[in-house]
Amino acid sequence: MAPVVLELLRRPAHFDVKVAVTGQHRQMLDQVLSAFEIVPDFDLNIMTQGQTLAQVTTRSLDGLDPILAAEKPDWVLAQGDTTTTFVAALAAFYHGAKFGHVEAGLRTGNPRDPFPEEMNRLLTTRLATLHFPPTPESAANLKADGVGDDVIVLSGNTVIDALLEVAAKAYLPTDPLLSEILDDPRRMLLVTTHRRENWGEPMGRIGVAVRQIVDAFPDVVAVVPWHLNPLVREALTPSLANHPRIRLIEPQEYVPFVKLEQKSTLILTDSGGVQEEAPSLGKPVLVARETTERPEGIAAGTAKLVGTDTALIVAEATRLLSDPEAYAAMARAVSPYGDGHAARRIADALEIPRSETLT
């Protein structure tokens, strides 16, 4: 959302912007706010240790309710497929505000995979006034759900807006370890995994695959910014700890992580955002999931689904690291996710008067 916030702030004659954050993924949130110099007007700070999805839902709704009652916004915007995005749409509906869904229309077709994100998307679609799908495929998904053409704005993905801005900037790391990693001339396998459906044995298999890949290629270093979740670390530690060419590092702020993506040779991830970012940087992506709501990258040839099967992950990584033609075919494929102007299209659409009728 950062590019959208900044674009709206550049149009004070049209928009009085207030920014609310839930505090979900606190460390990552603070990093992005700092990188884009955004100061929230409201911080719900909803997260407590060990809370359930139901508690996240109710705490988010309780936090947003008085804000919307006091501010009486014309529009509420939220991005993505989190529970808090669905709650923002529901709160906007309760308060008679129009809701704009950024990154709308992503689908896997299975309401429980990913859980709860797919259902969050479906419910948010029903509540939204205006839909901003990032790709033609996601726009088609909305139309298949009965959403009218007049409330669909094909925007591109704001993730790419943010990525291209950061990637173009020079960066001098202050962390000696990060500086060492970025200066290492060897090929880098960048690994990120955190998704709920991969916790436990599936994530353990990913770890085994990473170790086998590194053992097979003496010129490859694996860099793993591992998630703070103890379940993630418990699953990965047996395979990834104590290897001289596997670097387990703390979660990175947004800007240094983009620099790691730029430095990498190959990326193995279960992250939706990384699936979108990597193709714009010319980096092949192996997707450690059984399904993806971002099939555009698969169709374009920038990404390949490998699931969490150790043998398949190793085989595909080996192919790309051994075959220059196979690697080049993925690295040169055109990114389907946007051109860096999504925020402008979203702001333009919001300037047009619209009714509050749900579609």
Regions found by a protein language model. Name each.
Residues 101-115, 129:
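A short, histidine- and acid-enriched strand-loop-helix "catalytic/donor-clamping" loop
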Residues 20-27, 127-201, 205, 306, ...:
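A nucleotide-sugar donor-handling region in carbohydrate enzymes
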Residues 117-130:
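Membrane-proximal helix-turn-helix segments that form the acceptor-binding/catalytic region
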Residues 13-59, 63:
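Conserved nucleotide-sugar phosphate-binding/catalytic loop shared by glycosyltransferases and other
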Residues 322-359:
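C-terminal amphipathic helix plus adjacent low-complexity
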